[in-house]
Amino acid sequence: MKTLANYFSNNLNYNIILNYLIVLYAFCIPLSKAGISLFGILLILFWLMERNFKDKINLIQKEKIIILIILFLTLSFFSILWSSDKIFALDYLKKYWHFLILPIIYTSLKKDNIKFVFNAFLFSMLISEIVSYGIFFELWTKDGISPTDPSPFVDHTSYSCFLAFTSFILIYKIVYSSNLTWRYFYIIYFL
């Protein structure tokens, strides 16, 4: 067992794996809650297996927003202690577990890979848009989804937020894209 653990620790580049997992996590955000959970858990596991906690803590200490997120999660966790209904408190706290991913992304994502994360998110939103328009124009159906509210994979409120975020990314890409073909594609996608 010890040799297997040594083999993996010596031969795996955890940071490369983490960067791929972050891209897959971004892809799943508008499409699959199960995918978000799976890749979120894998991100946490590989981040812990990577170790290098001293450098990670130093990075986190330099970013106040990440510190605030960690403080919020810590306070939320300790609030279970004074809750009268522990089961409800734990269930409510589960909503915030995705915030654990933010320090992992901050400490692991390489600057060169940020474009891949945004592109994965945009591609999954494109898939979601195509399915949504298909439902809206009644080209196909999906159980429980009506043409009047064609948000196929997530609830309407989340889908609206994802659409707004997608719009911001697309505007950025339209303004700063040097490739004319891609610029036209982003304009059509935006419309």
Where are these regions (language model features)?
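Transmembrane signal-anchor hairpin modules in multi-pass inner-membrane enzymes, especially those
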Residues: 1-77, 81-87, 107-115, 119, ...
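Juxtamembrane membrane-water interface segments that cap and precede transmembrane helices
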Residues: 18-23, 140-152
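Hydrophobic, membrane-inserted alpha-helices
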Residues: 21-27, 101-102, 166-168, 189-191
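Short hydrophobic "helix-edge" motifs at membrane interfaces and signal-peptide entry regions
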Residues: 23, 69-70, 145-146, 190-191
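Residue-level signature of transmembrane alpha-helix interfaces in integral membrane proteins
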Residues: 46-48, 95, 144, 171
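Aromatic-anchored transmembrane helix interface
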Residues: 65-72, 86-109, 116, 120, ...
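Alpha-helical transmembrane segments of multi-pass inner-membrane proteins
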Residues: 77, 114-144, 154-191
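Residue-level preference for alpha-helix termini and adjacent loops
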Residues: 77, 81, 89-92, 144, ...
